[in-house]
From Swiss-Prot:
Cystine pairs: none
Assigned GO CC terms: cytoplasm; nucleotide-activated protein kinase complex; nucleus
Residue numbers of Phosphothreonine PTMs: T182, T295, T366
Modified residues (Phosphoserine): S153, S156, S271, S319, S343, S394, S440
Modification note: Cleaved in the vicinity of position 160 to give an X-DNA-binding N-terminal subpeptide and a non-DNA-binding C-terminal subpeptide.
Protein name: Cruciform DNA-recognizing protein 1
Gene Ontology biological process terms from the UniProt entry: signal transduction
Species annotation: Saccharomyces cerevisiae (strain AWRI796)
């Protein structure tokens, strides 16, 4: 068992300041316990005070609006130079204990409250027994009182019946004393009450509303005095939702094409400013001739870069661009020219074979620089065989076409006039071809149109003229 003594004590400070805080040895002088302001304006707080011995003291101090102060209503002691504290002894604490077992509420300004229940431990059996005995005694007393009242009421009823038999009166005229026979209080009308005594939500019922209030707790149906004059009761409209939506959509789509004519007007205004050609037919012909003239130049330049083989003979170079420049003639003449062109292709193939053989025997060495010249590969047997077969196939086609047309003799005479190039001429042609390869493609393309084109097709033109 600890020898500590505990007492509830109320600390107070008079009215005036805004805040008052209590501090002391209980919180190591931290100032953590504020006093509660009461309705009177003063500050109070009730708290338990612990004392280790009877001779021990409880030291404390007040902090009023941030200033440490000492109250004159409590005892003072000097701890050191210039420092004073209030203190309480056991005698001061015992005097204030008015009610044993009562506690005070600090938030309520130190008001007393009932004895708090036990915080821990099982409830005592003696208190239970006492409560049971008290409850039994109360019940027995209530039973005795109820039996006495019943006896008295029965005796009074018997006496009244005897009196009724003597005087000739009935029990209906006599009022009983029991609760069942007591009449109910008569309901009082609100209108009869004094003007000051009225309900929170007064109800003013008029003659019109009383007729329509058929349902209890609700307004009821509304009866209109003139239903025939109201259009909503007579007119009925059947509206199709799809038709109505179509109409509305059509009406809304009208303002959309407004921007159309503005664009067209701008185009029409700008159109006359465009230049118009006087002779469009002549211009198209000139463009076509220019294209035909450029195509042979491209064909002549491309083999210099890509093909490893040498260029064909000058006669072949002259004959190819002339074929593109053939002027439109009648149908029979065009067919003849096509056949003659195929015959020249066979001659070109033969000239290429002769050039390849001559290059194998004698290689021409020149001092001119070589531009993009690929190494020459020897021809295989298959390639030579294909070269031999190609002129035979072309001759067979020529014969078939000659049989269909009646100009066999003219073609044979013209082909016999053509002479095959000799070995010396082939050497000269190879030297010229190597020089042309070293030259730039632009220079070759510019020099070609300056040469006079005298070949097979040139002779044909002279004949037709």
């Amino acid at each position: 068992m600890s020898s500590e003594l505990m007492f509830n004590y109320t600390f107070s400070w008079p009215a005036g300041p805004k805040d008052v805080i209590l501090t002391g040895t209980f919180d190591d002088w931290r100032g953590t316990l504020p006093l509660v302001k009461t309705a009177k304006g003063n500050f109070e707080i009730t708290m338990p005070v612990k004392l280790a011995n009877k001779d021990d003291t409880f030291q404390f101090k007040f902090i009023v609006d941030g200033v440490w102060c000492v109250s004159d209503s409590y005892k003072k002691e000097h701890v050191s130079e210039g420092i004073e504290n209030n203190f309480l002894q056991i005698t001061d604490l015992v005097e204030t204990q008015e009610v044993a077992g009562a506690s005070r509420i600090p938030e309520a300004g130190g008001l007393l409250c009932g004895k708090p229940p036990r915080s821990a431990g099982p409830p005592s059996t003696s208190n239970r027994k006492k409560n049971k005995r008290n409850n039994k005694k109360r019940r027995s007393k209530l039973k005795k009182k109820s039996t006495k009242n019943n006896k008295k009421s029965n005796e009074s009823l018997d006496d009244n019946e005897e009196e009724d038999g003597v005087t000739g009166t009935t029990t209906e005229d006599v009022t009983g004393t029991s609760r069942e026979e007591t009449p109910l209080a008569e309901p009082t009308n609100v209108s009869k009450e004094a003007p000051g005594n009225f309900h929170i939500l007064p109800i003013d019922q008029s003659a019109d509303t009383t007729q329509s209030n058929g349902i209890i707790g609700g307004p009821g149906p509304v009866l209109v005095p003139n239903p025939g004059e109201i259009k909503e009761f007579t007119e009925i409209r059947d509206v199709d939702a799809r038709e109505l939506n179509e109409r509305l959509n059509k009406k809304e789509e009208v303002p959309e094409p407004v921007a159309g004519p503005i664009v067209e007007s701008s185009v029409t205004e700008k159109s006359p400013a465009l230049p118009q050609a006087d002779d469009p037919i002549v211009e198209t012909k000139e463009v076509a001739h220019n294209v035909q003239e450029l195509t042979p130049q491209v064909e002549a330049v491309t083999p210099l870069i890509n093909e490893p083989e040498p260029l064909p003979t000058p006669e072949a170079q002259i004959s190819i661009p002339e074929s593109t420049k053939v002027e439109p003639v009648e149908g029979s003449l065009q067919s003849k020219l096509v056949e003659k062109r195929e015959s020249t292709e066979g001659v070109l193939d033969g000239s290429k074979k002769v050039e390849n053989k001559a290059k194998k025997d004698e290689e021409v060495f020149t001092l001119d620089p070589i531009v993009n010249k690929a190494p020459k590969l020897p021809l295989t047997d298959e390639q030579t065989a294909e070269g031999r077969k190609s002129p035979a196939v072309s001759e067979e086609k020529e014969k078939k076409k000659k049989q269909e047309k009646g100009s066999k003799e003219v073609k044979r005479s013209e082909t016999s006039k053509e002479k095959k190039p000799s070995a010396k001429e082939v050497k000269k042609q190879t030297v010229k071809a190597s020089k042309k390869q070293t030259a730039s493609p632009l220079s070759s393309s510019t020099e070609e149109p300056k040469k006079k084109k005298t070949g097979f097709f040139g002779k044909l033109k002279k004949l037709f003229k």
